[in-house]
Amino acid sequence: MNRKLKDYTPTRFMAEGSTYNKAKADYAVSFIECLCHTKGIWAGKPFELIDWQERIIRDLFGTIKPNGYRQFNTAYIEIPKKQGKSELAAAVALLLCCGDGEERAEVYGCAADRQQASIVFEVAADMVRMCPALNKRVKILASQKRLIFYP
């Protein structure tokens, strides 16, 4: 299956002066699509974003303020059960940690309890293990629930 989002329209929540930067949005989408699914029937297959996921990524990473920084640095997204929340959250966390160009970037996951928070960490760690480029550059500290990226 090789489908691509055909009719993307930038977010209606763009602040005055902000613009849509297709190259930055394309980079974020491409980074995530280099990762692999870690669970279920899709395990080991490339993470091909479906339309609603791609719209979220393009809105968050392609909407740029006049100073060149992303307009959105916080997002609240509601996703129903069994719709790939953990996979998408892990992919975004890896993008922010390893692919955003920020030196010594820190990404934190929050949840109601430690076990719940560890779900996204475990998915991210598995994505790292399945991606040769990241596996060479990311140290997984499982006991601390920590990933360290070495550019």
Name each region found by the language model.
Residues M1-P151:
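Phosphate/NTP-binding elements of NTP-utilizing enzymes
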